[in-house]
Amino acid sequence: MYIAIYGKELGIRSGVGIFFSLMSVGLIFSRLIGGKLVDRGQLVKVVSYGTFFCLMGFFALAALNKIKHYNSSMVVGLFYVIALVLGVGYGLIFPAYNTLFVNLAPNNRRATASSTYMTSWDIGVGVGLVLGGRLADARGGLPLAYLVGAFAVAFSLMFFMRIAGPHFERNKLR
């Protein structure tokens, strides 16, 4: 996520470790709520909500550099609010997608489905970090990388709502 570098670029002196602590709070909070919604059959909504939170978080990260020029004191607060928002988003998405994959697989393939999801997540994070770093170095810095990431999340949300979510509802086994 390059958040430590970006925090320094924004002039945040209070330490970006707070960012990850607040992100953890968001993760824990969202897992409590998301789990109950999934138990009530709201899996597609949980994925959609989580993706929306991530979308807002990435758009806000991209905007922080511009906001800094108008109100630098506001940037620190927003930076930490974004941590909570991203924590909620990731906390909703990660376990919900795993449940989605497992619920599409027959009983004897559930572990394979979960492993496939985890591997896909890892590959996506790795590729995203490399592409984001190259984009930031070559073009417009980290704000551009976060903006491109936000558009990728927007595309994934549309894809999920139009194709993957309905496919899951039609084909789920549990």
What are the residue ranges of the model-derived segments?
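Transmembrane alpha-helical segments of major facilitator superfamily
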Residues: 18-27, 121
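A membrane-interface helix-boundary motif in multi-pass transporters
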Residues: 134-152
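Helix-to-loop junctions at the C-terminal end of transmembrane segments
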Residues: 30-43, 136-137
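Multi-pass alpha-helical transporter architecture, strongest
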Residues: 149-174
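Intracellular juxtamembrane helix-capping segments at the cytosolic ends
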Residues: 92-105
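Short amphipathic helix-loop junctions that connect adjacent transmembrane helices
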Residues: 1-15
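Structural signature of the two symmetry-related core transmembrane helices
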Residues: 45-60
